[in-house]
Amino acid sequence: MPRLLILVAVLLLSGCLTAPPKQAAKPTLMPRAQSYKDLTHLPAPTGKIFVSVYNIQDETGQFKPYPASNFSTAVPQSATAMLVTALKDSRWFIPLERQGLQNLLNERKIIRAAQENGTVAMNNRIPLQSLTAANIMVEGSIIGYESNVKSGGVGARYFGIGADTQYQLDQIAVNLRVVNVSTGEILSSVNTSKTILSYEVQAGVFRFIDYQRLLEGEIGYTSNEPVMLCLMSAIETGVIFLINDGIDRGLWDLQNKADRQNDILVKYRELSVPPES
């Protein structure tokens, strides 16, 4: 009987075993969700629109819980760069540099000064063109981050041998809005959210198999969905909704009218009504 218990314990623990990485992963492109595939496979527009993005602020006021850090924010502060990337990847917009506008203006001043005193390099002898103005601005912010929206788990233990799993869901929410540069009118606005999954699996054994002989062992692992990827997915989804809403409102149009029945556009059109909480 003791041997049988040992065998069961070993099998139980080995079944939950996840081998730790032997070395750090090599640099690679950032993984992307289904929202990125949808964004990059949208039907073509009649013409691309010049758009400017200044600053997507974090309005959550959330910080990482102790003991991780009391000074690091709970959500990434790179939402502006993510939105610019999403707008460009959609092939519907031409983003104009606005986040680093001061750096761009300084560089142009250096070129003009060199042109005036005759010391300009060969690659900058052509007079600078005026900066392109945007037709619309995309404003927005990270409007919410809620931790432990839902949690749960399941487990079992028999004669000191058992296993359990637990999970937790957090949620991040983003607001995006399209603003007419000429009038300041808000043409379209959307709120999107994405859940963040964290889970833990562990197993262990704690049992006396003989007098003064104790068998004890445990193993487990945790997996946390990166907040950065969830924020990127929420922004990409928001851009798709803005494009779809703009088509319906006549703000912009498709190159091919028949593409209104495109599978991706139809899917997001059906999702335009928020689900009940």
Curated annotation (Swiss-Prot):
It holds the Pfam family CsgG. A lipid is attached at C16 (N-palmitoyl cysteine). Residues 1-15 form the signal peptide. InterPro entries: Curli_assmbl/transp-comp_CsgG. It is a lipid-anchor. Its main location: membrane. A lipid is attached at C16 (S-diacylglycerol cysteine). It comes from the Bacteria. It is found in: Cell membrane. Keywords: Cell membrane, Lipoprotein, Membrane, Palmitate, Signal. GO terms for cellular component: outer membrane-bounded periplasmic space; plasma membrane. Belongs to the CsgG family. May be involved in the biogenesis of curli organelles. NCBIfam families: PRK15184.1 (NF011731). This is Curli production assembly/transport component CsgG. It comes from Salmonella typhimurium (strain LT2 / SGSC1412 / ATCC 700720). The gene is csgG.
